[in-house]
Structure formats: C-alpha cells, structure tokens
C-alpha cells in the first residue's frame, strides 16, 4: 500500500574471532584488525547504511561490501541475498558490537517506502545526520557530515 515501509531482512551473520593470515592478506587488513563480522541481507542500500552505522557504534572498518546486482530475487542460495558486507576490528567484542548495530539498522530503522498501492514502485529516502567512515569515504565528504541517501526510479 502507498507509503508502507518495505523492510529489508538480515539473512545471515557470522563472526570470525581470529582471522587467518591468508584471509587478512586478501582483505588488506591492517595488523590491528584481528576479527571479522560478516552479514548478508536482501537489500543493498539499506545494508550500506547499516554498515556505516556500525563504524559509528564500534571500533570497526568496512573492509568489503558488494552488491549482487541480480537482486535478492535472483540469489543463488537462500542466505546469499543481494549484498555481503564484512566488518573488521581489533577483537570479537568490537565486531560483535558493529554487527549488532548493523542488524538493528536493517531490522528497525532504515527501509524503502512504497510509492503505489501494490508496492511495485518504491524509493529509499534516508537522512543520515552524521556519517560514519564508510559512507563518508564513498560520498567524498568529511566523516560526521550529513548525507541524504536517496534511491528511486528514474522518473520519480
């Protein structure tokens, strides 16, 4: 229905408390980044917002975030979804805190909105009053600046 929230879902999470040297090398982790938190979800834009929030709530860095552009409806497995994100931090407690912040944003804060009665057209208009390190870098702004994250069909 028009103006209804269209919520995203977290599909899978995993914490790696002590990353292997080979994986650390592949992800270009610094020596202080010992632990990882992985998340998959069925909506990439909401998850990018959530990963940024994690960088504000915990001592973590987004070291990998990629969309699967076939979309969640075309995922190759039940838990693959539309995006995978990886947070790195100095210890399991920090990555767990970052992961919890990301999950909270996906489940309770950020969402698309229906623009018509059958929910076949939607938009994402999310105001971020203070960006974290992830979206700041991607948007080319200073960390802590405000950002409007907007996604909509071309004519809307």
Regions inferred by a protein language model and the residue ranges of each:
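Long, contiguous binding/interaction regions
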Residues: 1-43, 47-80, 88-156
């Amino acid at each position: 229905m028009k103006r209804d929230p269209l919520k995203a879902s977290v599909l899978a999470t995993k914490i790696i408390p002590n990353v292997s040297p080979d994986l650390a090398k592949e992800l270009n982790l610094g020596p202080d980044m010992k632990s990882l938190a992985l998340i998959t979800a069925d909506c990439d834009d909401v998850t990018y917002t959530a990963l940024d929030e994690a960088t504000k709530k915990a001592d973590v860095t987004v070291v990998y975030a990629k969309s699967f552009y076939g979309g969640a409806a075309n995922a190759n497995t039940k838990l693959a979804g539309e995006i995978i994100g990886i947070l790195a931090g100095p210890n399991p407690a920090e990555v767990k805190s970052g992961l919890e912040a990301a999950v909270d944003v996906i489940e309770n804060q950020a969402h698309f909105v229906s623009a018509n009665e059958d929910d076949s057209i939607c938009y994402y208009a999310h105001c971020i009053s203070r960006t974290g390190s992830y979206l700041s870098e991607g948007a080319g702004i200073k960390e802590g600046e405000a950002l409007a994250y907007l996604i909509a069909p071309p004519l809307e």
